[in-house]
Design a protein with these regions (language model features):
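The feature marks the mature, well-folded catalytic cores of soluble enzymes
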Residues: 1-209
């Protein structure tokens, strides 16, 4: 409801009527419904990744395979394509099919200035892009997103995380020179060693200039 007050909202769901009954009285002129089957709720991970290419809005549609084939993703992997076929996006938006490359939105973090932050644990997972080495992954991402550099975190995890250490649960850019991150100060906690190592890695990162 708070989002609708500020932005137009796209809702993908199996049953529009059920969602309307939960939302109640809102400004539905700001809501776009698209009914389709889904597996889960994580639009950040299965949804298209948007960029501007010489001022033209582009949506990359990567493969979503349920966080490394842990969960069913047969419906979620089709959502972005179905949205395009259903004329959901503006006419100037260009869809680009990025198959067979597997990539979730939550596995990468950008400062918007040419630097991308990610984790080795996730992107190098054998259940995603199993035949690509880290250098090949880096070259591919730099080419696709027009990056100057990629910062790889080798440490950091959260218990119960099924994503293989998505960076969006560990560290996020606040600006091009500031990163907020998860910290653990309890030496008895199972996360202490890994998050301390991650903190040291982050301290070694420098600005591009």
């Amino acid at each position: 409801k708070e989002v609708i007050k500020r932005e137009k909202l796209l809702i993908v769901c199996p049953d529009e009527t059920a969602v309307r009954s939960q939302l109640g009285e809102v400004d539905y002129s700001r809501v776009i419904f698209r009914e389709m089957e889904t597996n889960d709720t994580w639009a950040r991970d299965h949804g298209g990744i948007s960029v501007f290419d010489d001022g033209v809005p582009v949506v990359y549609d990567f493969v979503f395979n349920g966080w490394g084939m842990k969960f069913a993703a047969n419906h979620d992997n089709l959502i972005t394509r179905k949205l395009f076929h259903g004329k959901t996006f503006a006419d100037e938006v260009v869809p680009v099919n990025m198959q067979p490359f597997v990539l979730e939105g939550g596995s990468i973090e950008s400062d918007g200035k040419g630097t991308l932050l990610t984790t080795v644990e996730c992107l190098s997972s054998v259940n995603r892009n199993e035949y690509l080495q880290q250098e090949e992954l880096e070259n591919y991402l730099q080419q696709v997103f027009g990056l100057d550099r990629i910062l790889w975190l080798e440490s950091g995890y959260l218990a119960g995380d099924d994503t293989d250490s998505h960076v969006d649960t560990l560290a996020r850019f606040c600006s091009e020179d500031t990163i907020a991150y998860v910290q653990c100060t309890d030496e008895e906690d199972e996360h202490f060693a890994e998050l301390r190592e991650m903190e040291e890695e982050l301290k070694e990162f420098t600005q591009a200039n």
